[in-house]
Amino acid sequence: LIELRSGALRLSLAPEVGGAVAAFERDGVPLFRATSADAIESGDVRGFSSYPLVPFSNRIADATLHWDGATYALPRYLPGDENAIHGNGWQRAWQVLAVGNSRATVDLVHDAKRARAREWAFPYRARQ
């Protein structure tokens, strides 16, 4: 985990677990829900405080995207849910570009022509 501090604020970032936030506190008081030790140990991003929803948020019905006359089948990440949810950014490790005491930059590049193309048909880059 990457620990960042600024005055009374502390943020714990987990780039290897979907770019998720493990903790965000002010003077030791959680501002986001706490991430359990089990979620950190297992890498279960859904148990973290927050995680990025890229390249889309919420759900795409029946895990099928219709765009510009084409149809794209998307993965279903949650058992029992027939829809695609939250894109693939939360399923991927993010690359750490820079870390300082009070800031970090993490990056995710999705190349739609490579091995993970089935997850999203279009290239994108997300940075936080």
State each model region's role.
Residues L1-R127:
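Surface-exposed acidic/polar loop and edge beta-strand patches at domain peripheries
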